[in-house]
Amino acid sequence: MAKKVAGQLKLQVKAGSANPSPPIGPALGQRGINIMEFCKAFNAATQEMEKGMPIPVVITYYQDKSFTFVMKQPPVSYFLKREAKVQAGSKTPGKAKAGSISKAQIRTIAEAKMKDLNAADIDGAMAMVEGSARSMGLEVTG
């Protein structure tokens, strides 16, 4: 007999640094999920990844207080900032430019994010990444 799902929870946690402090502790604690068990499992699963990389995670918790989690790719904005070598996007995206990014770099990001995006092909994924770049104030070149 399959376990009965009590709900799902979406969090964004930095790779290798899950700990019971907010926002993780309160979010899991109020649902009765074992916080330390999640932190240990998440840190073990992300130990090969770059430390501090934000990882979206979907936690499915069951009525017997057990849980499973699925990790996704980091957000597009993380990849864009890393590729363009900027700390943050522009505060006024239509007017001031924060940096520039090439079509080749956009293609690399789109290929990495393809399974998380709802795009039919790589061109659709590239268009989504390009839109994110423009909304961050990055200039798309080449």
UniProtKB/Swiss-Prot annotation:
Keywords: Methylation, Ribonucleoprotein, Ribosomal protein, RNA-binding, rRNA-binding
InterPro entries for this protein: Ribosomal_uL11 (IPR000911), Ribosomal_uL11_bac-typ (IPR006519), Ribosomal_uL11_C (IPR020783), Ribosomal_uL11_C_sf (IPR036769), Ribosomal_uL11_N (IPR020784), Ribosomal_uL11_N_sf (IPR036796)
Gene Ontology BP terms: translation
rRNA-binding found in the keyword field: yes
Any Pfam family the entry gives: Ribosomal_L11_N
GO cellular component, one term: cytosolic large ribosomal subunit
Gene Ontology MF terms in the entry: large ribosomal subunit rRNA binding; structural constituent of ribosome
PTM remark: One or more lysine residues are methylated.
Function (record text): Forms part of the ribosomal stalk which helps the ribosome interact with GTP-bound translation factors.
PANTHER family: 60S RIBOSOMAL PROTEIN L12 (PTHR11661), LARGE RIBOSOMAL SUBUNIT PROTEIN UL11M (PTHR11661:SF1)
Family: Belongs to the universal ribosomal protein uL11 family.
Assembly mode: Part of the ribosomal stalk of the 50S ribosomal subunit. Interacts with L10 and the large rRNA to form the base of the stalk. L10 forms an elongated spine to which L12 dimers bind in a sequential fashion forming a multimeric L10(L12)X complex.
HAMAP family per record: Ribosomal_uL11
Protein name: Large ribosomal subunit protein uL11
